[in-house]
């Protein structure tokens, strides 16, 4: 099972961090970003998009932590998006659509 959560705390902030962990993490990164897949443990600036329309949600940092060398032991990612309610909400709304497909 792949899980995701806001890890930086709720409320408006400069940056919000959403963590994803589980076997579908690689697929989530591929579907929500464009261009090349990020290198392991390297912060990469990416456009983060809705999967159905490819509308840009935000431009932020994506960090890929392949398992078992991640701190969860599974494939894991962090999406660092702007901390507005809109960016966080749209990212949270997009993640389950990937997991249900």
Residue ranges, per PLM feature:
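A glycine-rich (often HGG/GG-containing) alpha/beta subdomain
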Residues: 1-95
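N-terminal low-complexity segments that are often proline-rich with Ser/Thr-Pro
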Residues: 97-101
